[in-house]
Amino acid sequence: MPMRPLVIVPDPILREISKPVEYIDSAVQKLADDMLETMYHAQGVGLAAIQIGIPLRMLVLDVSRNDEQKNPLVIINPEVLWLSDERNIYKEGCLSIPEYFAEVERPKRLCVRYQNREGKQTEIEADDLLATCLQHEIDHLNGRLFIDYLSKIKRDMVIRKFKKRAKEKNTQEAVL
């Protein structure tokens, strides 16, 4: 299971809307395994396929703690059925926006219908951290990032910072 390179802001692919997975076959199974390996290696709790440059409606999650047994979820073609009115605030980060964290307010609970890695239609009701992670990753599938919930000033500052990093990286690579 090879790890896949992560797509980093300001890459425009992160703003694309992902397409549904048509068939769950061995290629999709392998993609799920690669995504999980990539997520665990990067020490993340979630990863959407678009974050490795694949615009498919697919994500992986594991909110278990380091001292707990792994409990990975593979979620294909998710559809949010309902969101609670009650809200939570969590400090969020993103593998596509490394080393940046900000508080984001989201619904505390939700219900999602999806296909699991075997293609079986499933529903999950989640709250707190799992609900937040599901919403964060589903946002990726719709071309939305957690920084979109911040003020325009903060969001623009983050994007400028990452554009500058990308420019410096490209300059260094050109020198080598």
Curated annotation (Swiss-Prot):
Cofactor field: Fe(2+)
Pfam families xref list: Pep_deformylase
Catalytic activity field: N-terminal N-formyl-L-methionyl-[peptide] + H2O = N-terminal L-methionyl-[peptide] + formate
GO biological process: co-translational protein modification; translation
Record's keyword terms, sorted: Hydrolase, Iron, Metal-binding, Protein biosynthesis
One of the record's GO molecular function terms: metal ion binding
Enzyme nomenclature, EC number: 3.5.1.88
CDD domains, A to Z: Pep_deformylase
Segments passing through the bilayer: none
Cofactor note (record): Binds 1 Fe(2+) ion.
Binding site for Fe cation: 94, 136, 140
Protein name according to UniProt: Peptide deformylase
Primary gene name: def
